[in-house]
A protein has these predicted regions:
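Charge-rich, solvent-exposed alpha-helical interaction surfaces
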Residues: 6-9, 15, 19-22, 64, ...
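Acidic, low-complexity, intrinsically disordered interaction modules
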Residues: 28-103
Length: 117
């Protein structure tokens, strides 16, 4: 592994780590009011809760993106209703898992680099 290759991959991991960590800082990551039709019923979406987050490999095996899946938060429901936010803990856990996976991948990259030199 060349120094240039190592620097490129390490930089990519660092950027993804920052992105995933930022997602992990809040359960509702995007606030907006939109009308959504769901089974013939309209409701207002006030934000989105992260369901899962996972790093994505490109065809070269580099991690170049993070897939994040959201579920809508319904404004017509009680915002303190535990049922509505029941997945928030698991969502946060999924983001933390994605972050830790990236940290581990980055550490493996460092270890591989030092084995070469």
């Amino acid at each position: 592994m060349s120094i240039e290759q190592f620097a490129k991959e390490f930089s990519a991991y660092a950027k993804l780590n920052e992105y995933v960590k930022a997602l992990a800082d809040g359960e509702i990551v995007e606030m907006e009011c939109t009308q959504v039709e769901d089974e013939n019923d309209w409701y207002t979406v006030i934000g989105y809760v992260i369901e899962t987050a996972e790093p994505v490999e490109d065809s070269n095996g580099d991690y170049t993106a993070v897939n994040v899946y959201y579920s809508a938060v319904d404004a017509d429901k009680d915002p303190y209703d535990d049922e509505q936010y029941k997945d928030a803990d698991s969502a946060e856990s999924a983001v933390q898992s994605a972050y830790m996976a990236l940290v581990e991948e980055r550490q493996e990259l460092v270890n591989d680099f030092w084995r070469c030199y």
